[in-house]
Amino acid sequence: ADXQPGDSTDKLLAQKQDDV
């Protein structure tokens, strides 16, 4: 899950998906 740099929301979503 790699979100684009500067996208806090995308990063949070990506991290949550990675945690799953």
Swiss-Prot record:
Region (Disordered): 1-20
An annotated GO cellular component: extracellular region
Location(s), subcellular: Secreted, Extracellular space
Chief site of localization: secreted
Top-level division of the source organism's lineage: Eukaryota
Leader sequence segment: none
Annotated tissue distribution: Hemolymph.
The entry's keywords: Copper, Oxygen transport, Secreted, Transport
Molecular function per GO: oxygen carrier activity
UniProt record similarity statement: Belongs to the tyrosinase family. Hemocyanin subfamily.
The protein's role, per its UniProt record: Hemocyanins are copper-containing oxygen carriers occurring freely dissolved in the hemolymph of many mollusks and arthropods.
Subunit structure: Composed of 3 major subunits (IB, II and III) and 1 minor subunit (IA) which form homohexamers and heterohexamers. May also form larger structures.
The protein, known as: Hemocyanin subunit Ia
Organism expressing this protein natively: Panulirus japonicus
